[in-house]
């Protein structure tokens, strides 16, 4: 997973909750090309952050999905559903004007991981 591009932690534990900072489609320090590839890389980065914290997708209780083109919702949703399987945490999907480094999708997550 790429290092954060600004002054923040990729994830932070507060009691029994782990907050995964917004992840974009960075691989080896570069943004992957295209919304589908970015969505897959974003979810891989989220999974890696969760694993570092001792958890996985099944521990996620809430996700925020940001996209620069709400017209990509169905595509991003299908990739998200592949990753999460039967687990359906609460989620918001938000259209935004821009994301860091020209990303097309960003996802942050909150997981419940009792210590």
What are these regions (language model features)?
Residues 1-115:
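Short, polar/acidic, helix-capping and beta-turn segments at strand->helix junctions
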């Amino acid at each position: 997973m790429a290092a954060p591009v600004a002054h923040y932690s990729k994830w932070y534990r507060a009691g029994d909750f782990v907050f995964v900072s917004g992840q974009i489609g960075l691989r080896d320090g570069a943004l992957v090309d295209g919304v589908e590839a970015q969505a897959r890389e974003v979810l891989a980065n989220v999974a890696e952050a969760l694993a570092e914290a001792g958890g996985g997708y099944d521990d996620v209780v809430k996700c925020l999905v940001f996209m620069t083109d709400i017209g990509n919702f169905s595509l991003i949703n299908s990739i998200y559903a592949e990753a999460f399987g039967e687990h359906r945490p609460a989620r918001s999907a938000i259209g935004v004007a821009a994301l860091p480094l020209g990303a097309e999708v960003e996802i942050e997550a909150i997981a419940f991981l009792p210590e």
